[in-house]
A protein has these predicted regions:
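Bacterial N-terminal signal peptides
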Residues: 27-38
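Exported/periplasmic ABC-transporter solute-binding proteins
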Residues: 44-70, 74, 78-79, 83, ...
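Charged/polar low-complexity intrinsically disordered segments
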Residues: 10, 20-22
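Sec/Tat signal peptide C-region and signal peptidase I cleavage site
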Residues: 38-44
Length: 276
């Protein structure tokens, strides 16, 4: 009996040791699995990357605050001209939702398979003539643009920015384009166009009404709204992108739906957009 006891003790120690090793391996494996999955899950559910046209910058910053407060989903905004953003999306940029300044670019992305559905109008933009030059006050008939005192007129590049298209249409509507085309300086986006005017690199220029109504712009310069019959209505559309559906469907869908909510529409209206 005395000889048997050490043997039993050794067997028990061996079993316990092997059990502990197996448990450690399982714990390590679970830690690796959950450590790898958790960031992906959190990112998919808690962050949405939204490409926005530059005219939407100020309105979307306010919308972002309200959306994050209501849903707990973080919003990352990527701002540029609609044309440039569209090109980035076509080249594989990892954006979830595209909020354009027109319907053409999002429709083109849908036609090429980069968006999950046809674009839907979320707002209609309005064009203004704005200056930050002291003593200069824009007039609705635009004839003052012919003055020798005005040497540079800023517009967004019509090749990539819908508000640039509207600006050129306006000048042609008033039969001023040919006489003013040598004065035109082009911003890459409506945001850069605003910078040209704000820094007085241009004397005056065409930007979005949403920009001059932003709190950051209060009291800066003078502006006049361009009559809506002078240019094609700026119908602004949004789409969920294929990347958003494939990798972040819940967050992308939630943000897209919010754009058309009463809360979002009131924000757009506050910034001078025409809404339903």
């Amino acid at each position: 009996m005395l000889n048997a006891t050490p043997c039993l003790f050794e067997i028990n120690v061996d079993l316990v040791g092997r059990y502990k090793k197996k448990m450690k391996k399982c714990a390590l494996l679970l830690a690796i699995i959950f450590g790898w999955l958790q960031p992906l899950t959190v990112h998919a559910q808690k962050t949405v990357t939204v490409a926005i046209a530059a005219n939407m910058q100020f309105a979307m910053e306010q919308l972002k605050v309200e959306f994050e407060k209501e849903t707990g989903i973080k919003v990352e905004l990527i701002t540029s001209s609609s044309g440039k953003l569209s090109a980035q999306i076509a080249e594989g940029a990892p954006y979830d939702v595209f909020v354009s300044a027109d319907m053409k670019y999002p429709q083109d992305l849908y036609d090429k398979g980069f968006a999950t559905g046809t674009p839907k109008v979320y707002a209609i933009g309005q064009l203004v003539l704005w200056t930050s030059k002291p003593g200069l006050k824009p007039t609705a008939d635009l004839k003052q643009l012919l003055s020798a005192a005005i040497k540079k007129i800023a517009v967004a590049n019509p090749k990539t920015a819908p508000y640039g298209v509207a600006a050129e249409e306006t000048l042609k509507y008033y039969k001023l384009y040919d006489g003013l085309k040598d004065k035109l300086v082009y911003g890459e986006s409506i945001g850069q166009t605003q910078q040209f005017i704000e820094t007085q690199a241009a004397d005056i220029g065409f930007i979005a009404k949403s920009q001059v109504l932003a709190a950051e712009m209060k009291g800066r310069g003078a502006w006049v709204e361009i009559p809506g019959n002078a240019y094609t209505p700026i119908r602004q559309g949004a789409v969920i992108l294929k990347h958003g559906k494939d990798t972040n469907n819940a967050a992308a869908g939630t943000f897209y739906a919010y754009i058309f909510s009463d809360a979002a529409q009131q924000i757009f209206k506050k910034f001078g957009y025409i809404v339903n």
